[in-house]
């Protein structure tokens, strides 16, 4: 009798949890390196999933066998990965912008481990990513992401299987990859232009004074220019990145067309 009473709540919670778990596995904001362990991250995600339980519990209940249960869990994992992929685009773009800047100034060999994205990155890429994570929590993007996840259980219920995959899906994800390159290029462009002008000036000096080995000073000069401009430009860069992040986290832009059935 008691087992029958807890069977449906446990099954409902088991089915709604993989979408949350898969989404936050990709997102750098709750990575195991930042939190110090997987158990802490899983505990936070399980706690957040409790808020959407009433909405999922009110949806039509279906009897499922073991095979159907595995299919539903697999669908939830894939859907969570898709949402997490779209939500992580601003972080990847900003890390790419920092790597492009460091590569241009000749410091790409100084690679560091990015604890958020769990990948090797440059010092500037790590700085920008960590700054964006701070803005993610302080600027309201975390609440927008939770709102998008909560809406996803309404747009695509747990008991519903895969929708028809059309060309709209292909165009959508192609545009997301293009968005990564576009944001990275736009954010890094001012610093790249300044370093190019500095290197062009050194090339002119070397042309008119061949005896001077000015390119020995190329890396320190470009690094100084990039550091100085980054202090001035960082506020504008973070403002643009946070706007792009809030746009991505918006439930409508995040869930359409991914969650349209």
Curated annotation (Swiss-Prot):
Keywords: Cell membrane, Membrane, Plasmid, Protein transport, Transmembrane, Transmembrane helix, Transport, Virulence. One of its GO terms (cellular component) is plasma membrane. Pfam families: Bac_export_1 (PF01311). The keyword DNA damage does not apply. It is found in: Cell membrane. It is a multi-pass membrane protein. The chain crosses the membrane at residues 20-40, 44-64, 77-97, 131-151, 180-200, 214-234, 239-259. GO terms for biological process: protein targeting; protein transport. Belongs to the FliR/MopE/SpaR family. Component of the yop secretion machinery. This is Yop proteins translocation protein T.
